[in-house]
Amino acid sequence: MKARLSTKMVGESLEIHCETEFNRIRATAFPKAYFEKDNDTRTGSKGDYIFRDSDEADTEIVSIMFEMKNENDETATKKKNEDFLKELDKDRIEKQCEYAVLVSLLEPDSELYNSGIVDVSHRYKKMYIIRPQFFIPMITLLRNAAQNSLKYKTELAIVKA
């Protein structure tokens, strides 16, 4: 399939895959979530998707900027995941997202990236690199951690009062 696709189409096929996976479980797993393409280019750049979820009081509990990267096997100049982190961090900050996640099929032979969720927060705050199969688990982990954190903050506020 990849051989017939242009570079732009290969990248878009990864975006469509992730969007389809999310929409399959949206109604049951993320009923209040916002998950849309980032089409706002006023600041000069944009990520691919923004995920935001809120609690029952419509207080935002988590926000994630997603960038999806893929390339043809025949592409002459192979890009590395590292090449996209600075721009992703800039997009995360500009769009006021708490987390940034690079969903990538680049560097297909990398043991590091093939092993699971890679935390690159030592370079860029709250940033991760994942393969597409970890897309839904990553959203779930970050959202659940945020919900638990909110619960503890609420309990602490009650205790202090």
PLM segments and residue spans:
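Amphipathic, heptad-repeat alpha-helical coiled-coil/stalk segments that mediate oligomerization
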Residues: 5-11, 15-161
